[in-house]
Amino acid sequence: MLRTLEKATQKSVPLTVEDLGIEPHIFLDVAEKCGYQPVFTPHQKGTSVKLKKANIPVVMLYDANESKSFNFLDLSDLHVGHPKFDPRELEKILSRYYRNGKPLVDYVFIAGDLLEGITTDYYTYKMLEENKEERNRVINTRNIQVNQLLNILEKYDFDYRVINGNHEYGYEILGLEPPLRILERKMRAKGKRFTFYDTYMVDFIIAGVCKRMMHLESFDMRPGVIPTYDRLRKFKKNGGLWVRYKGKKYPIRFFQCGHLHHRQEVYDGSTKIFITQPGSFVKTEMVYAPGILVRGRILDNKSVIRE
């Protein structure tokens, strides 16, 4: 799904199942929720579409007049439902920042792929429309994954902020309700703070600056290429490294990326942006312990001081 969205921002794509790999109405629905504006043109197969980035959703958490401090935990790529998912490692890091029934961080940001999803190409939208038994089988898999994660997260009363990854979109491609929407309902029914943004990229205003969280569409594996740097260059070229909220500009100072499955922190001095890749909770990929604590304060010149 995400690579198809990325492809459609670069060139027109025929609006057919064969070319998109998914049902056109689902593709357009997801594109709209992710802040894209479709531009349609005639094509020999009917209609083609090219996506224009209209806006990235912006969420105000708190501005500099409320606090110039920040204190949050970055996570991504839990992959609950994967045979090698490590629930003990997830509980370990959540409990580290939770003492005596109180969180030690203001927010927990999770940048997609909370669930393993459906990783086989066997299922299709049409199949599930026509075959109730197969549809129920996929729904059961989704519900098992959702409930497994629910049983972990509900123990820790954090303020969770989460987005989709490519694995969650696997369910939407099949025409099913977004699993993280279901998880949000279940968490809130238990009185927990859990906010799901039905997109793969969202901006948060924190202490007078912007934190951009996204699940990378794809990444370049060539030696010497840092995928997050490459993405920042594209952001800079296509609109700048700042966001506007209610007429006020906020510089991007934090950039959290999911999808890469390796833990890394990078500070880019040229843009003054801290990049975090929180790692994966798949046992065979945990060279370094996943999760990154981001704590400090913002100076008057919008520079970041990490503690």
PLM-predicted stretches and their roles:
Residues 60-73, 203-213, 269-273:
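Beta-strand-turn-beta hairpins that frame and shape the catalytic cleft
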Residues 184-191, 205, 212, 217:
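Extended, solvent-exposed, turn-rich assembly/linker loops in the middle of proteins
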Residues 61, 85-196:
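Core catalytic region of metal-dependent phosphoesterases/phosphodiesterases
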Residues 74-77, 106-113, 160-166, 195-197, ...:
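Active-site neighborhood of phospho(di)ester-bond hydrolases with catalytic His/Asp-centered motifs
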Residues 194-204:
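Short acidic low-complexity segments
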Residues 210-212, 219-307:
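Conserved beta-sheet core of the metallophosphoesterase superfamily
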Residues 1-74, 79:
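Acidic, histidine-bearing metal-coordination/catalytic regions of metal-dependent phosphoesterases
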